[in-house]
Amino acid sequence: MSDNAIHIDIMIEAGNWPDEASLESLVSKSVAAAWNNLGLKSATSELSVVFTDDASIQLLNGEWRGKDKPTNVLSFPAFPVKAGSQPGPMLGDIVIARETVEREAKEEGKPIENHLSHLVVHGFLHLLGYDHETDEEAEVMEAREREILHALAIPDPYAVSDEDINND
């Protein structure tokens, strides 16, 4: 993201999150890796990332997606963007829930920082028009996530371990 200026607003709304500077560093690195991977042109853009808890994200998930349960990440694009096209100056909002992120990282045996980076990348790709409603869309989006996370030295979040195979 060498010539880009993405202004990232970090808001800790609720939950037991690390300090804002640590979160800002993680988000900035994740977003820069995604921007570079996508080969987007230089731009000045704005992004908001809200760090909250399960109760707050459950309300949003119910209101916007009709699902009355917490989730790990929600994305709210400022404007519709077609995957692969240049975004406008306002990207949108990403909301992440602490308890769900923590639980998933523990269940999947991965560092919470790696899982959090993955969710930032996942949410950012949604803001840029990527989705996973169909198998084809999911393949494209997950391939992008793998490439971006690899650039951050984070292992493939979708890899199936031998232990997973043996427990089925």
Swiss-Prot record:
Binds 1 zinc ion. One of its GO terms (cellular component) is cytoplasm. Its EC number is 3.1.-.-. Keywords: Cytoplasm, Endonuclease, Hydrolase, Metal-binding, Nuclease, Ribosome biogenesis, rRNA processing, Zinc. GO terms for biological process: rRNA processing. It comes from the Bacteria. SUPFAM superfamilies: Metalloproteases ('zincins'), catalytic domain. Its cofactor is Zn(2+). PROSITE patterns: UPF0054. Zn(2+) binds at residues 122, 126, 132. It is an enzyme of class 3 (hydrolase). Belongs to the endoribonuclease YbeY family. Single strand-specific metallo-endoribonuclease involved in late-stage 70S ribosome quality control and in maturation of the 3' terminus of the 16S rRNA. This is Endoribonuclease YbeY. It comes from Brucella canis (strain ATCC 23365 / NCTC 10854 / RM-666). The gene is ybeY.
